[in-house]
Protein backbone atom coordinates (compact mmCIF):
# COMPACT_ATOMS: atom_id res chain seq x y z
CA UNK A 1 0.00 0.00 0.00
CA UNK A 2 2.79 2.43 0.90
CA UNK A 3 4.53 1.72 -2.40
CA UNK A 4 1.30 2.40 -4.30
CA UNK A 5 0.84 5.70 -2.48
CA UNK A 6 4.41 6.73 -3.28
CA UNK A 7 3.88 5.98 -6.97
CA UNK A 8 0.56 7.84 -6.99
CA UNK A 9 2.34 10.88 -5.54
CA UNK A 10 4.98 10.69 -8.26
CA UNK A 11 2.42 10.24 -11.05
CA UNK A 12 0.26 13.13 -9.85
CA UNK A 13 3.26 15.39 -9.25
CA UNK A 14 4.69 14.84 -12.72
CA UNK A 15 1.35 15.51 -14.37
CA UNK A 16 0.79 18.67 -12.33
CA UNK A 17 4.34 19.96 -12.82
CA UNK A 18 4.08 19.44 -16.58
CA UNK A 19 0.63 20.98 -17.00
CA UNK A 20 0.69 23.76 -14.40
CA UNK A 21 4.39 24.55 -14.08
CA UNK A 22 6.50 23.36 -11.15
CA UNK A 23 6.61 26.76 -9.34
CA UNK A 24 2.79 26.84 -9.28
CA UNK A 25 2.42 23.45 -7.58
CA UNK A 26 2.92 22.96 -3.83
CA UNK A 27 3.00 19.77 -1.80
CA UNK A 28 -0.41 20.75 -0.43
CA UNK A 29 -1.77 20.96 -3.98
CA UNK A 30 -0.43 17.47 -4.67
CA UNK A 31 -1.93 16.10 -1.45
CA UNK A 32 -5.30 17.71 -2.28
CA UNK A 33 -5.23 16.24 -5.78
CA UNK A 34 -4.71 12.75 -4.32
CA UNK A 35 -7.07 13.34 -1.39
CA UNK A 36 -4.40 12.40 1.13
CA UNK A 37 -3.06 14.35 4.09
CA UNK A 38 0.13 16.43 3.73
CA UNK A 39 1.60 14.26 6.48
CA UNK A 40 1.05 11.17 4.34
CA UNK A 41 2.90 12.84 1.48
CA UNK A 42 5.77 13.87 3.78
CA UNK A 43 6.07 10.27 4.94
CA UNK A 44 7.25 9.44 1.42
CA UNK A 45 8.98 12.70 0.40
CA UNK A 46 10.59 15.31 2.63
CA UNK A 47 9.61 18.23 0.41
CA UNK A 48 8.92 19.18 -3.20
CA UNK A 49 12.61 19.21 -4.14
CA UNK A 50 12.80 15.59 -2.96
CA UNK A 51 10.08 14.73 -5.50
CA UNK A 52 11.89 16.67 -8.22
CA UNK A 53 15.12 14.79 -7.52
CA UNK A 54 13.26 11.51 -7.99
CA UNK A 55 12.14 12.71 -11.41
CA UNK A 56 15.61 13.92 -12.25
CA UNK A 57 16.99 10.44 -11.64
CA UNK A 58 14.58 9.02 -14.21
CA UNK A 59 15.35 11.86 -16.59
CA UNK A 60 19.09 11.18 -16.30
CA UNK A 61 18.65 7.50 -17.13
CA UNK A 62 16.48 8.28 -20.15
CA UNK A 63 18.79 10.98 -21.43
CA UNK A 64 21.92 8.87 -20.95
CA UNK A 65 20.29 6.11 -23.00
CA UNK A 66 19.17 8.56 -25.70
CA UNK A 67 22.68 9.99 -26.00
CA UNK A 68 24.25 6.60 -26.63
CA UNK A 69 25.43 6.54 -30.25
CA UNK A 70 25.85 3.47 -32.46
CA UNK A 71 29.25 1.89 -31.92
CA UNK A 72 31.60 0.36 -34.45
CA UNK A 73 30.45 2.47 -37.42
CA UNK A 74 30.01 6.04 -38.58
CA UNK A 75 26.60 7.67 -38.04
CA UNK A 76 23.93 8.05 -40.71
CA UNK A 77 21.10 10.57 -41.01
CA UNK A 78 18.63 8.03 -39.62
CA UNK A 79 20.79 7.70 -36.50
CA UNK A 80 20.65 11.45 -35.93
CA UNK A 81 16.88 11.49 -36.43
CA UNK A 82 16.33 8.60 -34.02
CA UNK A 83 18.62 10.11 -31.41
CA UNK A 84 16.84 13.45 -31.63
CA UNK A 85 13.48 11.72 -31.35
CA UNK A 86 14.57 9.94 -28.16
CA UNK A 87 16.05 13.13 -26.71
CA UNK A 88 12.95 15.20 -27.44
CA UNK A 89 10.67 12.43 -26.13
CA UNK A 90 12.60 12.58 -22.86
CA UNK A 91 12.32 16.36 -22.84
CA UNK A 92 8.56 16.05 -23.43
CA UNK A 93 8.03 13.58 -20.59
CA UNK A 94 9.99 15.79 -18.17
CA UNK A 95 9.17 19.09 -19.85
CA UNK A 96 8.71 20.95 -16.57
CA UNK A 97 12.46 20.58 -15.98
CA UNK A 98 13.16 22.58 -19.12
CA UNK A 99 10.30 25.03 -18.90
CA UNK A 100 11.19 25.91 -15.29
CA UNK A 101 14.90 25.16 -15.63
CA UNK A 102 16.37 28.38 -14.25
CA UNK A 103 14.06 28.41 -11.23
CA UNK A 104 14.72 24.76 -10.34
CA UNK A 105 18.50 24.89 -10.77
CA UNK A 106 18.85 28.20 -8.94
CA UNK A 107 17.65 26.64 -5.69
CA UNK A 108 19.17 23.16 -5.94
CA UNK A 109 22.94 22.90 -6.26
CA UNK A 110 22.92 19.11 -6.64
CA UNK A 111 20.57 19.25 -9.59
CA UNK A 112 22.60 22.09 -11.08
CA UNK A 113 25.71 19.91 -11.07
CA UNK A 114 23.85 16.89 -12.45
CA UNK A 115 22.25 18.91 -15.23
CA UNK A 116 25.65 20.36 -16.12
CA UNK A 117 26.92 16.80 -16.53
CA UNK A 118 24.04 15.97 -18.88
CA UNK A 119 24.73 19.11 -20.92
CA UNK A 120 28.42 18.25 -21.12
CA UNK A 121 27.65 14.74 -22.35
CA UNK A 122 25.09 16.06 -24.86
CA UNK A 123 27.64 18.59 -26.13
CA UNK A 124 30.29 15.90 -26.56
CA UNK A 125 27.81 13.60 -28.31
CA UNK A 126 26.58 16.33 -30.68
CA UNK A 127 30.14 17.14 -31.69
CA UNK A 128 30.95 13.45 -32.11
CA UNK A 129 27.94 12.84 -34.37
CA UNK A 130 28.57 15.93 -36.50
CA UNK A 131 32.21 14.97 -36.98
CA UNK A 132 31.11 11.42 -37.82
CA UNK A 133 28.74 12.70 -40.51
CA UNK A 134 31.56 14.77 -41.98
CA UNK A 135 33.95 11.83 -41.83
CA UNK A 136 31.37 9.62 -43.56
CA UNK A 137 31.08 12.14 -46.38
CA UNK A 138 27.43 12.84 -45.60
CA UNK A 139 28.27 16.42 -44.64
CA UNK A 140 30.65 18.82 -46.33
CA UNK A 141 31.78 21.20 -43.62
CA UNK A 142 34.93 22.65 -42.14
CA UNK A 143 35.91 21.85 -38.57
CA UNK A 144 34.67 25.24 -37.27
CA UNK A 145 31.36 24.76 -39.12
CA UNK A 146 30.93 21.29 -37.64
CA UNK A 147 31.61 22.59 -34.12
CA UNK A 148 29.21 25.53 -34.59
CA UNK A 149 26.46 23.24 -35.90
CA UNK A 150 26.90 20.90 -32.93
CA UNK A 151 26.67 23.78 -30.45
CA UNK A 152 23.59 25.22 -32.17
CA UNK A 153 21.91 21.81 -32.06
CA UNK A 154 22.49 21.59 -28.31
CA UNK A 155 21.21 25.12 -27.67
CA UNK A 156 18.03 24.60 -29.70
CA UNK A 157 17.30 21.21 -28.15
CA UNK A 158 17.79 22.57 -24.62
CA UNK A 159 15.72 25.74 -24.94
CA UNK A 160 13.21 24.93 -27.69
CA UNK A 161 10.27 24.46 -25.32
CA UNK A 162 10.98 27.80 -23.64
CA UNK A 163 11.04 29.49 -27.04
CA UNK A 164 7.81 27.77 -28.09
CA UNK A 165 6.09 28.83 -24.86
CA UNK A 166 7.31 32.43 -25.23
CA UNK A 167 5.79 32.69 -28.71
CA UNK A 168 2.48 31.31 -27.44
CA UNK A 169 2.45 27.78 -28.84
CA UNK A 170 -0.38 25.77 -27.26
CA UNK A 171 0.35 22.32 -28.68
CA UNK A 172 3.56 21.23 -26.97
CA UNK A 173 3.68 17.92 -28.84
CA UNK A 174 3.66 19.83 -32.11
CA UNK A 175 6.36 22.07 -30.66
CA UNK A 176 8.53 19.02 -29.97
CA UNK A 177 8.01 17.83 -33.54
CA UNK A 178 8.90 21.27 -34.87
CA UNK A 179 12.00 21.32 -32.67
CA UNK A 180 13.30 18.08 -34.16
CA UNK A 181 12.75 19.38 -37.69
CA UNK A 182 14.42 22.68 -36.78
CA UNK A 183 17.52 20.84 -35.56
CA UNK A 184 17.68 18.71 -38.70
CA UNK A 185 17.43 21.84 -40.85
CA UNK A 186 20.63 23.08 -39.20
CA UNK A 187 22.39 20.16 -40.88
CA UNK A 188 20.70 20.54 -44.28
CA UNK A 189 22.99 23.24 -45.78
CA UNK A 190 26.03 21.02 -45.23
CA UNK A 191 24.59 17.85 -46.80
CA UNK A 192 25.47 16.47 -50.20
CA UNK A 193 22.67 16.79 -52.77
CA UNK A 194 21.55 13.16 -52.45
CA UNK A 195 21.58 13.33 -48.66
CA UNK A 196 19.61 16.58 -48.69
CA UNK A 197 16.92 14.93 -50.81
CA UNK A 198 16.91 12.04 -48.34
CA UNK A 199 16.53 14.47 -45.43
CA UNK A 200 13.60 16.20 -47.14
CA UNK A 201 11.94 12.81 -47.62
CA UNK A 202 12.44 11.95 -43.95
CA UNK A 203 11.05 15.35 -42.93
CA UNK A 204 7.90 15.03 -45.04
CA UNK A 205 7.25 11.52 -43.70
CA UNK A 206 7.72 12.74 -40.13
CA UNK A 207 5.37 15.71 -40.50
CA UNK A 208 2.59 13.79 -42.30
Model-assigned labels for residue ranges:
Residues 5, 9-12, 149:
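N-terminal positioning helix adjacent to the helix-turn-helix/winged-helix DNA-binding module
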Residues 8, 16-54:
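Helix-turn-helix
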Residues 68-93:
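Hydrophobic alpha-helical connector segments
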Residues 99-101, 113-114, 142, 199-200:
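Short, hydrophobic secondary-structure boundary micro-motifs
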Residues 110-136, 147-162, 178-189:
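Amphipathic alpha-helical packing segments from all-alpha helical-bundle domains
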Residues 162, 166-208:
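C-terminal peripheral helix-coil segments that are non-catalytic and often amphipathic
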Amino acid sequence: MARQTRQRILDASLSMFNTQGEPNVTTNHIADELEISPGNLYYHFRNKDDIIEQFFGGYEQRMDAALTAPSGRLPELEDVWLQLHLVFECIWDYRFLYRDLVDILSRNRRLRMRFARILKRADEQAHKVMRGLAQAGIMRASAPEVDAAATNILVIATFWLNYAAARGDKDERASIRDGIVQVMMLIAPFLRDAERVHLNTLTRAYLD
